[in-house]
Amino acid sequence: MAKSKVFKNCLALLLITLVAGFALAVVNEITAKPISEAENKAKMAAYESVFSGVEFEEINSSDKLIKAENDSAPVQNASVDDVLRAVDKNGNTVGYVMSATSASGYGGDVKIAIGISVADDKITGFKVLSHSETAGLGAKCTEDDFQNQFAGKSAGKLSYVKNAAASDSEID
């Protein structure tokens, strides 16, 4: 008698698990595409905020470009995730927009988008896409005062200073 009760309980548990797993798979299938579209729309809105008035084109060899950027990047624990070409109405390349992820955030990964103009090698915009920083000081990275200070700065190496920025390569 005890063996049949254990078998019945195992069978019931198996049936419940199969139904729950199937339900989760169906929900995932239904929601995967809308979630992906919403994420892509948010990413493109961020790209437009860091380089406005242009259209974006995929770069044919972007995988090679991203690998080269990651191999030569002077920043540790960071990687370039995406690179798009910014083109004007005439199809001329006016800059690039890229997203990158740094694993050096205090609370985890920090993902950013940045636009760079090829005409003057200046940053056209900067936006934090996602972060897990602590409320207070770390989360201030999403405030306009912080993000807007990058626009117009040299796309080369930037230095963080405690006092007011005195040169094109400093942020405060």
Annotate each language-model stretch with its function.
Residues 1-172:
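Flexible, solvent-exposed loop/hinge segments and secondary-structure transition points
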